[in-house]
A protein has these predicted regions:
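Membrane-proximal, proline-rich intrinsically disordered regions
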Residues: 1-53, 81
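Structured, solvent-exposed acidic/aromatic patches
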Residues: 55-224, 230
Length: 230
């Protein structure tokens, strides 16, 4: 595909956001045989550790994540695949759309939080605010800093999309690329607020006042209606 093809019909932004969406659960074939990361990042890691999944035929001599003999190769998979394939696409999408494509920018922000909150819940401190910052040498943020950043990202996304809906009623430039919500910007706002509620519940013990504030903020938005697919 040429640069000219990419610039037509929002392809440059839409294709990138499609990769990010599939990168949430790593069910995207990145080429070179990279169509199996979901097994490592989810099945052999969180699913086994939590007891959600068990292997009928013992692997690794019957000693691995199922009995808390944690396997470095399995446990590092989410980190490696996120920072090698998904976060670079997020970073490029933010930079490419920030000033020119507000709707795509807002959706990128929401997807960024959706992708990375799973990563910080796996590992704790993660590289977030200093990603691609060579001077900071990819300094990791604490989990508290990351969660605070998540809430700010969602603030930005909801504000940008809300304004865009008012200024461009009925717009759906992203529809043909959107495998989650069919390019419906109202649904993306609902998703952002339901995601805010989920994150608020995650910090309810560690930071109850912050959790209460964020949960109430989500509920206060007129776009949030829970019995929808968002």
């Amino acid at each position: 595909m040429t640069d000219e093809n990419l610039q037509a019909d929002y392809n440059e932004h839409g294709i990138r956001l499609g990769i990010i969406q599939q990168g949430i659960y790593f069910n995207y074939d990145y080429g070179k045989g990279k169509n199996w990361p979901f097994q490592l990042t989810q099945n052999l890691n969180a699913d086994m550790f939590s007891g959600y999944m068990h292997d009928a035929k013992p692997l690794n001599g019957g000693s691995h994540n199922l009995d808390y003999n944690l396997q470095d190769g399995w446990n590092s998979a989410m980190w490696g695949h996120t920072y090698e394939y998904v976060f670079p696409q997020i970073y490029q999408s933010e930079n490419a759309t920030r000033d020119r494509m507000p709707a795509f920018f807002g959706i990128t922000k929401i997807l960024k939080v959706e992708v990375m909150h799973r990563v910080t819940d796996y590992y704790g401190p993660i590289v977030y605010s200093h990603f691609a910052d060579l001077e900071a040498r990819y300094m990791p943020d604490t989990q508290k800093e990351v969660y605070n950043a998540f809430f700010c990202e969602l603030d930005t996304a909801v504000a940008v999309l809300s304004d865009y809906i008012v200024e461009h009623p009925g717009a759906s430039e992203f529809a043909r690329f959107d495998m989650l919500l069919d390019g419906d910007y109202d649904s993306w706002i609902k998703f952002a607020n339901s995601l805010r509620m989920r994150l608020a519940m995650r910090i309810a013990v560690a930071s109850p006042e912050k959790a209460k504030t964020e949960f109430r903020k989500a509920v206060s938005y007129t776009h949030l209606t829970l019995p929808t697919k968002a």
